[in-house]
Amino acid sequence: WKVADAGETLAEQAFGAGANWMTIICAAPLATVERGHEVALRRGGEIQMELFGHWTLDDARAWHHIGVKQAIYHRGRDAQASGQQWDEADLAKMKALSDIGLQLSITGGITPADLPLFKQINVKAFIAGRALAGAANPPQVAQAFHSHIRDIWGA
C-alpha cells in the first residue's frame, strides 16, 4: 500500500498481517504519518515515506522529528522512459535526506552500473524490479547487484 490517509487503521492492518514496513506517500498529512508511526512502533515495524511528486526538506525533517527513519526516493517509470537519468539534483536531494538522518530505499530503473552514484547516500535498500524482471539472466544481474554493493559499501 501507499497510504495517504487513515494511517492508524491501515498500519494496524498491515502490521497485523505481518508487514515489517508500511509506505506512506509524502502528500499525506503529518497526522497520518504520526498515527501510522505510532502503530509501527507498537508493532515493531517501521514507516517509509515515499517521496513522489512535491515534498520539501522541511517535510522530511518533520517526518524524522516524529521518528520516521526511512524514505523511498523514487524516479518514476515515465520519467525514466522519457530519458530522465539520475542527476546531480537527485543526488543532492538524497544527500540532504541522508544528512537529516533518513535511510533511503532507491528505486526507478536502478541497474548495477548506477550503484556507484549513490556511494555518499545512506542507502537502506535498492528496489530493482525492472533490472531483474527484464533481464535475459536475472540471477546474473542479481549477482552483479550483490558484487557492486559489496565493493562499494562492504556489506
Residue ranges and their predicted role:
Residues 5-16, 54-66, 100, 104-106, ...:
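Catalytic cores of alpha/beta
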Residues 53-58, 62-96:
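Active-site rim beta-loop-alpha module in soluble metabolic enzymes
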Residues 1-5, 28-31, 54-57, 77-87, ...:
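Short, small-residue-enriched loops and turns at beta-alpha junctions
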Residues 17-31, 71-82, 121-145:
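Glycine-rich phosphate-binding active-site loops on the catalytic face of alpha/beta enzymes
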Residues 9-59:
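Hydrophobic, well-structured mid-protein blocks that either form specific transmembrane helices
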Residues 1, 22-24, 45-51, 71-73, ...:
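Hydrophobic faces of well-ordered beta-strands that scaffold small-molecule active sites
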Residues 1-8, 60-66, 133-150:
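Conserved N-terminal beta1-alpha1 strand-loop-helix module at the mouth
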Residues 36, 87, 94, 119-121, ...:
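C-terminal helical cap(s) of enzyme catalytic domains, especially alpha/beta-barrels
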